Amino acid sequence: LKDKKRIAILGGGPSGLFMFKRLVNTGNTDLSITIFERKNKLGSGMPYSAEGANDEHITNVSGNEIPPLVTSLNDWVKTISKDTLDKYHIDAARFNEYKVLPRLLFGQYLTAQFDLLQKQARETGVTYHVRYNTTVSDIIDRPEKSSVIIETEDGEQSEFDHVIICTGHNWPRKHEGSVPNYFDSPYPPVKLALKLNHPVAIKGSSLTAVDAIRTLARYNGTFDKDKNGKLFYTPFASHPDFKMVMHTRNGMLPAVRFHLEDSHLLNDSLLSKDEIKDHIKANDGFLSLDYIFERDFKLPIQEKEPEFYEKIKDMRLEEFVDNMMALREELDPFLLLKAEYAEAERSIKHKKSIYWKEMLGVLSFALNYPAKHLSAEDMQRLQHSLTPLISIVIAYIPQSSSEELLALHQAGVLELIPVGEESMVEPHEGGGAIYNYTDEHKNEQSVHYQTYIDCIGQPHLAFEDLPFKSLIEKRTVTPAKLKFQSADEGLKAMNSGKPVSKDEQGDYYLKVAGITINDNFQVMDAYGSFNERIYMMAVPYIGGYNPDYSGLDFSEEVSGIIIERLMV
């Protein structure tokens, strides 16, 4: 084994699956791969296992949007037992790749793909070892030996040449457990199997909030269909005061999933990596947000939707966002949901995209990788302006979830309150939380909810939250930061209390979430040198440099970037 390249994959969820696929597909028998998995099963990770889903939770992607694995979802569905199909109300004969499916079932698919890849590895002579029920407690870099030590919770140490961190989602607990009925996230959803006779506060309206709503609704009432096939909800008579109240900054619901023309978010019209490199070189070493907005959003729209293009061609980014948000703000969110549901239904029926929405998803994906080259000024613009619109429009809430939200609202058990930018939540020692906010009429509100659930989705974690302490102590990793293009703007931001630092050259830097990585997802140290041995694929720790990540597409793309570098 000594002469083999020893590679550790930390985490056997979807990211680990795509990384393992890349390694196995090389057919390289000079590799020795070890997968460390905290649980007793590979593939499903958090979102597609009981840690992140119950039977009622569905994916927001369909088979045709999943990057290729070993077998297609369509073919796999034909191989599963009738009991499983019946449990999830799936007819294998009528199943097609355009349908979303239950998350737990999708988790089984990912596990099956991992099994097939292991079989492939055995057949091609690629050495691998899976360490189930193993938690990695530390990563110790040994540059002098060109190796990395992985330490597990039981104190055991193993040496590797390369480590790829694929640890997936992480929701730190702040008050959950010490404050009754206060939840830092809705996961695992089994904890929300609660019968409640009071209003429940839900922070956020993202897909994470929809997960919480789907679970709570089932424990406090029933869904049925009327004679026209329309869904309606009846709360239990014993719970007359049960209600769910979503709180959002802008009082908006996510947009409804529609037919995507290019299901993998990789559009032919996008700027190439070389074009982006050339642009950065010509622009003082910065990527311009306006340039990306013109080239990766407006131009493709000109060809596909010339009428829409005429409306937006002279708009700057902020103006475009304000325009789109204003359209959403004018309408009651549930009326808008109803209208978008009908529009999305037509889009799916006729397999015709809603092109500007699709391109917004493409723009978000295209911005993700080079975002670390934005100036601090442009990153602030992105976070303040574009990100809120993107998070609403490309959430792609599935049809059945839209139907449930509309039925719950009609039954009077679901409402949405806009709370603005300055709202604050305080845990209440008796249970739940106090929601402090300014309402639409500029009145200060302070409302106690006996149950509170934070549903804003995966937070971008701070540098200090990285669980592998030796990486921080030995300065193997460093906090992510972005340079200000203008020193005046940097000074202004520093004086206004933003996390800004100044170096010896007089340049100003904005601290952003997570750690510093390069374009190959290698971690970087305090001196700006990249590490040949350690790769970071765990999205919660690179949020500053990767502001948007699109699940499986992200795993597919990044594993491809890493394998190129590993196999040099």
What function would you assign to each model-found segment?
Residues 1-46, 50, 93-568:
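Flavin (primarily FAD) cofactor-binding/catalytic cores of flavoenzymes
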Residues 61-112:
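Conserved N-terminal/central alpha/beta ligand/cofactor-binding core
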Residues 50-75, 242-243, 265-272:
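N-terminal glycine-rich dinucleotide-binding loop that anchors FAD/FMN and/or NAD(P) in oxidoreductases
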